[in-house]
Amino acid sequence: MTVLDNKTKLNYQNGYLIYNKKYIFKGKFLSKDQFKIAEICFNTSMTGYQEILTDPSYKSQFINFTFPLIGIVGCNNEDYESWKIHASGLICNELFELSSNWRAQTNFTNWIISQNSCAFFDLDTRAVTKIVRNFGPKNIMLCSEEYFENKGICLLYTSPSPRDAIP
């Protein structure tokens, strides 16, 4: 358990990223839910994660960031592309818990949870990117270790892909 801002307690759980039954990555899962399913894509930007997550073109997608450290700048009210996070969640190598920028109004992890999104981290995102590049974007599942052990892969193959996600 990690304490942030001396107010919010966030529980990181052990979890799994499941891509096409063949590729299963273990990492840390931060979410109010036990699992989430969405299409995966990747982004190679070094900055602008708040803008990327709030961009409506990423609706119903997990964004795999190839830059290794996400969250250090925090979040503010000026860097939104739209009024909320449209991405289903993010995947990154390291999720920074504290903000280190004079413009930050909240830290990144609290913002993710307050927007009902999720994060999956502590894995090699370069390996995930190579899989997506080679086999294409597909629905993946991010889930807690407990959920994976009980229901896991079965649910992934009964979930339809989103169609016409952007109005």
What are these regions (language model features)?
Residues 157-167:
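Single conserved hydrophobic/aromatic residue that forms the stacking wall/gate
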